Amino acid sequence: MVWDVFVSYRHQAPDGPWVRGVLVPRLQEAGLAVFVDVDSFRLGMPLVLEMARGVEQSRHTLAVLSPAYLTSNFTELESVLAEHLGLEASERRLLAVMREPCRPRLGIRARLWLDMTTDEEVARNLPRLVEELRAPSGVVS
């Protein structure tokens, strides 16, 4: 794998600015290789192929959950691709953080996610997220 994590998020505010201005820099400061679309998608390539490349070449996909995330077909595709790869390899590929309260689809609700709805929760849970992202995808038992 080339990347530690592919970040799946909505570009619109407040999600995009928080991901690009807070989350990604802090993950990179922790030494993680982060695949984020605005920096890693190749110009001129079809978006769907670049999404698939990001998911396939990353050990984990991190879904940044919010009401806006749930309305996007693109973010749904990214999370479904990660779930599918995880099922194929019996690995834990899809992780999630809750940025804004929302009710994700069942496949994501069935997973434990980290609360990052406030600055205090970000400070408390970011070290755990970094630790999880550093760990191998791992076989699900």
Residue ranges of predicted features:
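Conserved TIR/SEFIR loop-to-helix hotspot centered on a Trp-containing motif
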Residues: 67-88
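Short, polar loop motifs at secondary-structure junctions
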Residues: 98-104
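Conserved beta-strand scaffold positions in the cores of enzyme catalytic domains, especially
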Residues: 94-96, 113-115
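Short secondary-structure boundary/capping segments
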Residues: 86-87, 104-106
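Conserved N-terminal substructure of TIR/SEFIR domains
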Residues: 1-64, 83-92, 99, 120-141
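Secondary-structure boundary/capping motif
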Residues: 14-16, 43, 71-74, 105
